A protein has these predicted regions:
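Conserved Rossmann-fold NAD(P)-dependent oxidoreductase catalytic core, especially the SDR/UDP-sugar
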Residues: 94-134, 154
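Substrate-positioning beta->alpha
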Residues: 171-177, 191-213, 219-220
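Active-site Tyr-X1-5-Lys
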Residues: 130-159
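Mid/C-terminal beta-alpha module of Rossmann-like enzyme folds, strongest
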Residues: 211-274, 309-320
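Conserved C-terminal active-site "lid" loop/helix of NAD(P)H-dependent oxidoreductases
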Residues: 37, 202, 237, 260-299
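NAD(P)H-binding glycine-rich loop region in Rossmannoid oxidoreductase-like domains
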Residues: 51-87, 98, 116
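Amphipathic terminal alpha-helices
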Residues: 290-295, 299-320
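N-terminal Rossmann NAD(P)H-binding glycine-rich loop of SDR-like oxidoreductase domains
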Residues: 2-21
């Protein structure tokens, strides 16, 4: 049995299917504050579980072999600053307390590259922690709570993953929005096309999960982004080549884009995906290097271009 806290989300659903398909688990329990679309499928059970509250020890009939803590408040904007800390820190405390209560010795926690803040140059796991957002600021102390759990008893194993923005089949996030905007001919660079942006394909992330589950080290911390990390202009060129698009893509200064995003967002009652905070975030460099994975010899199956091919093979409707 494996338990995925935050299992109703994009990563959790893909992870559950991969664990079952590869035989790493015969039963996956998805615990989330939202119902899961996978509930009731073979090998999958689900519960409405709020990690901000103490977690009952009888969540599953037998103790889990692995616990995956993906639960987090992460959308920016959308929450008050205090909400990131209330959820992400309470969640870390309650999930680790649950692991102790049921005697589970293996825990995988998803943190974020947001703990580094903006990264102009290549940044690996040895870089200083310098978050600039409440989300990033809440994730590093959550890492430390998990580390305290790992160090509190012999035989415990902890994997901490700091992923970039994860994309792939079924996720209507930044990459899919960029693809659709390029296809329709209205994408513009938010600032410079030369900034590096670090993204991770869901299938590659799941490869890294399996790789780390098989490692012997008691504590591992790693970045997950596709290697190499490329400038935004190169990512756009890959999308255009994949789509066969000749639409020009021009850089627009933030002094124009941010006010325009504010007007659009206000006109749509605050429900626009084009939000000033997201525009500024899109223009912020994230030059992340998966140093730990490279040092351990992890076989990266995807770069950005090949991930688009695999994505369209799995979910052609996303590209329709």
């Amino acid at each position: 049995t494996c338990i995925i806290f935050g299992g109703a989300g994009f990563i959790g659903a893909h992870l559950a299917r991969r664990l079952l398909a590869t035989g790493r688990a015969s039963h996956v329990h998805l615990a989330d504050v939202r119902p899961s679309a996978l509930a009731g499928q073979p090998g999958i059970t689900a519960s409405i579980t709020d990690v901000r509250q103490p977690i009952p020890a009888d969540l599953t009939p037998e103790p889990p072999a692995w616990i995956f803590n993906l639960a987090a408040v992460h959308r920016e904007p959308g929450h008050e600053a205090i909400e990131y800390f209330e959820t992400n820190l309470a969640g870390a405390r309650n999930v680790t307390a649950y692991a102790t209560a049921v005697g589970c010795a293996n825990l995988y926690f998803t943190s974020s590259i947001a703990v580094y803040g903006p990264t102009e140059g290549p940044t690996d796991e040895s870089a200083p922690i310098c978050p600039v957002s409440p989300y990033g600021g809440s994730k590093y102390p959550a890492e430390l709570i998990h580390e305290y759990w790992q160090q509190a008893a012999p035989g415990r194993r902890l994997v901490i993953c700091r992923p970039g923005v994860i994309y792939g089949p079924g996720d209507p996030g930044n990459i899919l929005r960029m693809i659709r905007a390029i296809r329709r001919g209205y994408f513009a660079y938010p600032g410079s096309p030369d900034i590096h942006k670090s993204y991770g394909y869901i299938e590659g992330l799941l490869d890294s999960v399996a790789f780390m589950m098989d490692r012997p080290e008691p504590l591992l911390r790693y970045n997950y982004v596709e290697d190499p990390t490329e400038p935004l202009g190169a990512l756009v060129d890959h999308v255009k080549a994949h789509l066969g698009s000749r639409a020009p893509v021009l850089p627009l200064p933030l002094t124009l884009l941010v006010p325009a995003a504010g007007l659009i967002n206000a006109a749509l009652g605050g429900n626009s995906p084009i939000h000033p905070v997201r525009v500024r975030k899109a223009a912020r460099p994230t030059h992340i290097v998966p140093g730990t994975l490279k040092a351990l010899g992890f076989p990266f199956r995807f770069d950005f271009r090949s991930s688009l091919i695999d994505w369209q093979r799995q979910a052609p409707q996303d590209f329709a």
